[in-house]
């Protein structure tokens, strides 16, 4: 255990200092049941990302159909192009529901008494790593989705076509797979700029409200501790030298940003207030020290998907750092 998570004896600025081995942490017997459950979800995450990355959309076919409304052949071509894409979008949406359940199981394990968040991380490094992997996936998914306007265009065309056919009393086969209720929920999901992050944020808020006997600090301290762990690993050369690849560096940055955003949505006053347990200036500084093209998406996530950045109580210095 000691070689997986090393707690340093020094405490600087009262923030926890750890090295959490994101590359090699393995589950203990006590973690295995939850770890297996989360692992079954995470094993599909790479194929989801590959699928989203390959998503080209049916923009040309839709334009042709709209410009030539009386050409039945072009209407059919557009419809036949869009339907398989909508099935793919449904698969992404359904994965978000699985991720939501997975996160709630993890939060249950990582926040339950009598242990503190620090003790949980010491005892359950493999679960902490899975939590990190969920955040990593989430930010990668949302980065890809934000860069792909075809998703909403395709889905809007699909919904318009379904509505038009319903008026004409036509039932299309795809409605057996994506019925009206499912389409409504998918519509709300894809309307979000960062749908997966919104899912995690809602899941965390729901977890806090459902577990009324659990102090909210148990959840927010779990998030702030994880953010501190990542920041320290990124800014300490002896830790960074332990990463075996650049991808682990990116992983660590994405996880840090992900937990900051979650903290900001769940904590009553957010991540940017003076009483926040996250060193926001330090976290932003660490990001800004990286090559700009690798962190622009992460800085944008802090700018546009946090809840409290523009509160009056947020220091001008922090706001200026994110200009």
UniProtKB/Swiss-Prot annotation:
Pfam families on file: CYRIA-B_Rac1-bd
Q: Does the keyword Transmembrane helix apply?
A: no
Q: How does it sit in the membrane?
A: Lipid-anchor
| Coiled-coil portions | none
Membrane-spanning ranges: none
GO biological-process terms attached to the record: regulation of actin filament polymerization
Where does this one sit in the cell? Membrane
Per UniProt, which keywords does this protein have? Lipoprotein, Membrane
What does the entry list under GO cellular component?
A: membrane
Please provide, alphabetically and separated by semicolons, the GO molecular function terms listed in this UniProt record. small GTPase binding
**Main location as per UniProt:** membrane
Q: Does the keyword Lipoprotein apply?
A: yes
* Highest taxon of the lineage: Eukaryota
Family, similarity comment:
Belongs to the CYRI family.
Describe its function. Answer: May negatively regulate RAC1 signaling and RAC1-driven cytoskeletal remodeling. May regulate chemotaxis, cell migration and epithelial polarization by controlling the polarity, plasticity, duration and extent of protrusions.
Mind telling me what this protein is named? CYFIP-related Rac1 interactor A
